[in-house]
Amino acid sequence: MDPESIMAADGTDSAPANGGLAMENVCVKENGAVSVETVDTTSESQNENSANSSTLDTIEHVKEAAEGTQVEHVDDSKCMKGEKAQRKPRHEKLSGGKNNSSVHIKKSKEGKSADAKVAASNGSVAPNVQTTNPLKSKSFNGREAQVTKQGKHDSAPAESADGEKVKPKSQKKQAHETSEDDTQSSNSPKADDGKPRKVGALPNYGFSFKCDQRAEKRKEFYVKLEEKTHAKEEEINSMQAKSKETQEAELRMLRKSLNFKATPMPSFYQEPQPPKTELKKIPPTRPKSPKLGRKKTASGADSEETQTPRLGRLSLDERASKDNPTAKGIMPTVDLKKQPVRKSLPRLPSQKTVLPDGKPAPAKAAIIPAKVRPEKKKLEKDAETVNQTSHPTEEEAQVTVSSNADVEDSHETVSPRMNEDRADKSIEVSEAVAVEH
């Protein structure tokens, strides 16, 4: 780049080797101190982070200087002359085909904004950093964009008025360009595939998490657990049903096998039964004669009654028998017992005797032996002899005879065995009577 492109107020020229632009604004104050301001527009940081940090630092320094110092503005006329002198050679070199990057850069509006000197309170001059306002200078931002599109250029060291060399820095991108790119990328985000992505959606990173795989494994595990629990519940239900059936069957068998033994109720719980009336049995048929209804005791009593007066009568003759026991031929009772007893058979109805009254003779008369009849005759003879002494004896004899006849009549209808027994008794009685007489 030609030295005419850069013009200072004091007439010093500095030209970088690579065509980069370095501006030096030197202003002389009253105290004679010189402040040198160098702004390297083409040499910026290599990466975006350094450019952003540098711009932030310059803004902070400007604020601090404004608060603690007084800023004095230089006349715009001097700066405008230098800028006009710079524009003419730039247009000439654009037609010649040289590097366009350093030519198109203008500092017209920067000159308007400020080449300022900071004067301290003690009168010393502090170096003032020239800052750019991107909001005011739209044209400058557009030109910077054109410079970045053409390529990267390394700035050569520039010589200042004092003979110092400034080392230019390699520039990759400007801070404004990076900020604009960031805003464009934030406004219109695109995925790796080039498709527009929704605002708020997560970007598609190159790696994948294992959460999905773990979720699938969890689902499979829970499904298996549910199947196991269902199988266990079914087994438990089946076992309970079987146990109920077995219990019911056992209960039925027990009910069939059980035999309850009831104890009898005690008697005091029961009401006493009413007393039963004993009914006498009436015989179905009447007896043939009133003699059949008589008892043996009654017949025995009659016989005893008949014998008692006889004994009383015989007691009168006991004295005579005691005086002459052999005269009357009394036999001992032992001999009478030793004599054999004759048993008579019952007679047939044709053999029965008939009494003079027209009644049949009793069967007892046939049973009595023939010896009894002479004894009766003897009794009658004795009665006649006794009549001489007393009449009542005859009457008693007749009573005895009639009683014997009644006894014989009463035993007519008795069974043959009873007849035999009574016949034996009558024989003994007759023998006893005979012995007494």
Swiss-Prot record:
Biased composition range(s): Basic and acidic residues: 58-86, 151-167, 408-437
Region (Disordered): 1-22, 38-210, 254-437
UniProt record, GO biological process: cellular response to ethylene stimulus; microtubule bundle formation
Gene Ontology, cellular component aspect: cytoplasm; microtubule
Biased composition (Polar residues): 121-140
Pfam families: TPX2
UniProt-recorded name of the protein: Protein WVD2-like 5
Species of origin: Arabidopsis thaliana (Mouse-ear cress)
